Amino acid sequence: MRLLITGISGNIGNELSKKLEKEEIDFLGLDIVNNKMNSKKIISNDITKLKNLLKEKKLKKIDTLIHLASKINNEKDVTKIGLESIDVNIKGTINLLNSLPNLKNILFASSYMVYGIPLQNPIKENHKLEPQNIYGISKVITEKYLQVFCKEKKIELTIFRFMGIYGFSENYTSQAIPIFINKIKNNEKPTIFGDGNQKRNHLYVDDAIDAIITWLKNTKAGIFNIGGANTPTNLELISLINKKMNKKVQPIFVKQEQHDFIADISNMKKILKFTPKIKIKDGINKTVEKF
């Protein structure tokens, strides 16, 4: 197996690379950002530049791809977000596929955002795809392109639709849990949209990495929801964070319709043979210690 991981310098890619090195699994990383890893294992390149990718001789031998590279943009300018998402998430993926002539297996990191507003809970993989933001739209388009491409090229495709992944340090604050932690740490009231009773099976980063490793050791094609073991409410999250920090910061409630978002992870358990280990309380405690 000759493995390539895109987005190797990102939060998930960085943690994955550490685990792979620990388990002595050989890999090649690709990222636009230079990091401090062994330079022999990293290709510094931009997936939006096909000509540059085609010059990379090491890519010709790759037969297994873990595609983590993605653009998550918090810009308020919808046009700018759209252009960047198309450029990186969609065009970048197409360029990547065109520069890897010997692919046999692909694992694509997608997102729960492809579903949009749940029609029912728990959400199965065959749920209608109606994303409510540009990031989700770009993931749906990329999924569909990969399905057509892989069918034509006879490549085994696996799609992981990750629930919100938490457990990173404070520089990663686009998810509810790190936002809540930052607020409570600074004695600021976190904002809760709705009544705070909405449930979601957040996924701790170590479990996300272990799910990828499990796939790597025994590849299974298909689409899988990858979510955590528990389904806490936002109020429960804030309570756990307060307890760990020995604080009593109360939230601000903003009236807004909210929905439970609970992924059905039965296929993950039955077919992938993977079960998340980190309970929400332990995950929150570990995350707080990183801030």
Which positions does each model-derived feature cover?
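NAD(P)H-binding glycine-rich loop region in Rossmannoid oxidoreductase-like domains
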Residues: I47-V88
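N-terminal Rossmann NAD(P)H-binding glycine-rich loop of SDR-like oxidoreductase domains
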Residues: L3-E23
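C-terminal substrate-binding subdomain of Rossmann-fold SDR/epimerase-dehydratase oxidoreductases
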Residues: I184, E188-F291
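Active-site helix of classical SDR
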Residues: S138-I141
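SDR active-site strand-loop-helix element
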Residues: T6, L30, L65-K71, I106-Y112, ...
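Conserved Rossmann-fold NAD(P)-dependent oxidoreductase catalytic core, especially the SDR/UDP-sugar
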Residues: H67, I94-I134
